[in-house]
């Protein structure tokens, strides 16, 4: 394979992995520990 193809596939895999992990943190079990700043400051 060409080095550019390998680099493109690796970069795409990293981007997909980071996106999947951020979705997991936002909506998965760890999201229970996230604080909502709008709920902290009631006016």
Curated annotation (Swiss-Prot):
Top-level lineage group: Bacteria
Cellular component terms (Gene Ontology): plasma membrane-derived thylakoid membrane
Subcellular location per the Swiss-Prot or TrEMBL entry: Cellular thylakoid membrane
Any one GO biological process: photosynthesis
A Pfam family this chain is assigned to: PsbN
Protein family per UniProt: Belongs to the PsbN family.
UniProt name for this protein: Protein PsbN
InterPro entries: PSII_PsbN (IPR003398)
Membrane topology summary: Single-pass membrane protein
Transmembrane stretches, start-end: 7-29
Entry keywords, A to Z: Membrane, Thylakoid, Transmembrane, Transmembrane helix
